[in-house]
Amino acid sequence: MAAEKFETSLKKLEEVVRKLEGGSLSLDDSIKAFEEGVKHAAFCAKKLDEAERKVEVLIKQRDGSFRKEPFTTDNDD
């Protein structure tokens, strides 16, 4: 999964969710699908965290210049 892209993994995760919600899988197949989904969810979460750390916000100063600051959200602790 290392060379996999975020979008590909997200699509696979969505497919797993559809299969599980469909209710037609056996218990064993449901467990396998769940395990696959957990791997894709973890991969996507990691990629999103990496992307968030790369994003910087430009803050305009009073003199018209800009400074970079890390991107933060309201729910950061």
Curated annotation (Swiss-Prot):
InterPro entries found in the cross-reference section: Exonuc_VII_S (IPR003761), Exonuc_VII_ssu_sf (IPR037004)
Enzyme class: hydrolase
Molecular-function GO term, any one: exodeoxyribonuclease VII activity
Gene Ontology BP terms: DNA catabolic process
Source organism, top-level taxon: Bacteria
EC number: 3.1.11.6
A cellular component term, taken from the record's GO annotations: exodeoxyribonuclease VII complex
UniProt subcellular location: Cytoplasm
Catalytic activity of the protein: Exonucleolytic cleavage in either 5'- to 3'- or 3'- to 5'-direction to yield nucleoside 5'-phosphates
Keywords carried by this UniProt record: Cytoplasm, Exonuclease, Hydrolase, Nuclease
Function field: Bidirectionally degrades single-stranded DNA into large acid-insoluble oligonucleotides, which are then degraded further into small acid-soluble oligonucleotides.
The protein's assembly and partners: Heterooligomer composed of large and small subunits.
Family under the similarity heading: Belongs to the XseB family.
PANTHER family in the cross-refs: EXODEOXYRIBONUCLEASE 7 SMALL SUBUNIT
Name assigned to this protein: Exodeoxyribonuclease 7 small subunit
Originating gene: xseB
